Amino acid sequence: MEGGGRRVFSNYDLQQVTSSSTTIQENMNFLVPFEETNVLTFFSSSSSSSLSSPSFPIHNSSSTTTTHAPLGFSNNLQGGGPLGSKVVNDDQENFGGGTNNDAHSNSWWRSNSGSGDMKNKVKIRRKLREPRFCFQTKSDVDVLDDGYKWRKYGQKVVKNSLHPRSYYRCTHNNCRVKKRVERLSEDCRMVITTYEGRHNHIPSDDSTSPDHDCLSSF
């Protein structure tokens, strides 16, 4: 009903508006405590563990109790979960790899030690050479008659000398005696004869050289 530019509401309309507002308020009163309860539950759990990670409610189907499980790796580490087992497996793998590396290093060391032993044996053989005897004689002939038969097997040029160095080996069976003949660089008339080893046989009987007795005495 309208009059003088004003709108007049009937009692029915006011009652309907009041009832609708009451219904909205009741609905809000019903919803607000539910939301406040959830918010309070969240903050209470987070405030109780200030140093740990945030937690969320976990509902059990068999009971109405609510438990809060923190998010993170603490459960796995404490309970021996998959992370803890992985750490143990990694340690075991590292230990196994170390064992394989040790075996490989031991085999490498043994091979090197074996080669080192061979080198040492060669050095010992070189040190255990036959004794040497050196004679210096004034002669026009390079090869002196010493009562043994020799075969020339090598020759080498000597530095600062006009005469080469000759190498001879005894022709007797199973005799390993060698000799080296060269002339002195300061005096070409002097012949230097160096013997290596000892003869295991007697000299020849057809030797007529005057130096036979001297050279065959060794």
UniProtKB/Swiss-Prot annotation:
Protein's UniProt keywords contain Ubl conjugation: no
Main location class: nucleus
Annotated GO CC locations: nucleus
Subcellular location: Nucleus
Biased composition (Polar residues): 64-77
Matching InterPro entries: WRKY_dom, WRKY_dom_sf, WRKY_plant
Biological processes annotated in GO: plant-type cell wall biogenesis
Chain segments annotated as transmembrane: none
This protein's record includes keyword Transcription regulation: yes
A molecular function (GO) term: sequence-specific DNA binding
Main function: Transcription factor. Interacts specifically with the W box (5'-(T)TGAC[CT]-3'), a frequently occurring elicitor-responsive cis-acting element.
One Pfam family cited in the UniProt record for this chain: WRKY
Gene designation per UniProt: WRKY12
Organism: Arabidopsis thaliana
Chain intervals with Low complexity compositional bias: 49-63, 105-116
Disordered: annotated segments: 49-120, 199-218
Similarity annotation: Belongs to the WRKY group II-c family.
Name listed for the protein in its UniProt record: Probable WRKY transcription factor 12
